[in-house]
Amino acid sequence: MTQPIFLVGPRGCGKTTVGLELARACQSQFVDTDHWLQTKAGRTIAEIVEKEGWETFRALETETLKAVSAPSTVIATGGGIILAEHNRGFMREHGIVIYLCAPVATLVERLEAFPEEGQRPTLTGKPISDEVSEVLAERDALYREAAHHVVDASQTPEQVVSHIVTALRLACAS
């Protein structure tokens, strides 16, 4: 598989964890767009959003997406990358998009276990369970629109990777 693989989904669905495992399984490079952007900017996402706003952050996110897209690369994207139609189109045209789908309860449980508050600024200012439910309701259709494959991410990272590898093999065989 030489095309980039883009992992999309909400906060807490496991894009980074699964992405690292998938890259190992596919003998590919791995890039997390949030991490790459923060390293390049020398600031956290929360700092960028606080000082420059969401619009500036989303523009930087688009630049990052294009900069890291390369053959034989697994790319964990930020949860909101699909908000821009041009990002959804870019990923679909230049690679394979996998939506890591999980129920709200699973996402909330993971986010409460690993809050990483500095990296994950609130999107709505509401309690985490309300925010996750609201954001997923707004974005689920966009994740599905962007995705070539939808994978249940409520399982272990190893199981999720196994399902992705199977889906990719079936896609290549057809």
UniProtKB/Swiss-Prot annotation:
Transmembrane segments: none annotated. The gene is aroL. It catalyses: shikimate + ATP = 3-phosphoshikimate + ADP + H(+). GO terms for biological process: amino acid biosynthetic process; aromatic amino acid family biosynthetic process; chorismate biosynthetic process. It comes from the Bacteria. Its EC number is 2.7.1.71. It is found in: Cytoplasm. Its cofactor is Mg(2+). Pfam families: SKI (PF01202). Keywords: Amino-acid biosynthesis, Aromatic amino acid biosynthesis, ATP-binding, Cytoplasm, Kinase, Magnesium, Metal-binding, Nucleotide-binding, Transferase. It comes from Enterobacter sp. (strain 638). One of its GO terms (cellular component) is cytosol. Residues 112-126 are annotated as: LID domain. Monomer. This is Shikimate kinase 2. PANTHER family: SHIKIMATE KINASE, SHIKIMATE KINASE 2. Belongs to the shikimate kinase family. AroL subfamily. One of its GO terms (molecular function) is magnesium ion binding.
